[in-house]
């Protein structure tokens, strides 16, 4: 695919998942380069679509293009390559010398090389002067056989609760064609 990541749709996630599942048969690790605007969404989707993936699948990208003299792309690719070579199965996001679980990475900054954070879970690895420092105890064990689950429901609405939100939004959602509503509520305190 050669697509601006802001244009990616669930159909592309399905295509990426299918191609990755096929490639798992012949490779020991896979690196997927991706634009940063939606990379976290793709990493999360792949985490749930590639159930029990037997090899490392690592997504990475860069804030500055590869041809830019100060690009972060080479460092991010090295980080992704180190994780892909680790042999540890799972879907991961590698960025700014950190490796996080694919379902935990979130883009939190639009500029700056530290654009991604692992939310409510520490990074599972870091690249340091000593190489890739893995925290294996943080990586969930693969307990199921590999299978591709590429059926997606796109009729889900994400609602972020905010102070002053008009409760009438719930009536509108009930009248819509959505099959599910995910409510991003306030924290626990």
Feature map (PLM): residue ranges:
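Short coil/turn connectors at secondary-structure junctions
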Residues: 25-29, 52-56, 86-90, 95-96, ...
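Short, small-residue-enriched loops and turns at beta-alpha junctions
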Residues: 4-7, 66-67, 188-189
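Internal gly/pro-rich beta-alpha loop/helix module
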Residues: 59-128
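Short beta-strand segments
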Residues: 32-34, 58-61, 92-97, 160, ...
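ATP/NTP phosphate-donor binding region
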Residues: 1-22
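Short acidic, glycine-rich surface-loop motifs adjacent to enzyme active sites
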Residues: 27-39, 176-188
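Short Gly/Thr/Asp-enriched flexible loops that form oxyanion-binding sites at enzyme active sites
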Residues: 32-54
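Accessory alpha-helical/coil subdomains and C-terminal extensions
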Residues: 101-183
């Amino acid at each position: 695919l050669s697509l601006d990541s802001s244009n990616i749709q669930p159909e592309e996630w399905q295509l990426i998942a299918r191609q990755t599942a096929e490639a798992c048969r012949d490779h020991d690790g896979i690196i997927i380069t991706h634009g940063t605007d939606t990379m976290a969404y793709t990493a999360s989707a792949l985490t749930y679509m590639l159930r029990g993936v037997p090899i490392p699948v690592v997504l990475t990208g860069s804030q500055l293009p590869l041809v830019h003299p100060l690009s972060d792309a080479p460092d991010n690719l090295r980080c992704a390559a180190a994780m892909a070579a680790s042999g540890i199965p799972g879907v991961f996001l590698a960025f700014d010398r950190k490796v996080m679980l694919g379902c935990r990475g979130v883009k939190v900054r639009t500029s700056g090389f530290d654009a991604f954070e692992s939310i409510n879970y520490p990074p599972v690895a870091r690249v340091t002067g000593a190489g890739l420092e893995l925290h294996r105890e943080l990586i969930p064990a693969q307990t199921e056989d590999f299978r591709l689950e590429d059926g997606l429901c796109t009729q889900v609405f994400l609602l972020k609760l905010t102070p002053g939100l008009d409760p009438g939004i719930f009536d509108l959602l009930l009248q819509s064609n959505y099959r599910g509503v995910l409510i991003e509520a306030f924290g626990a305190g």
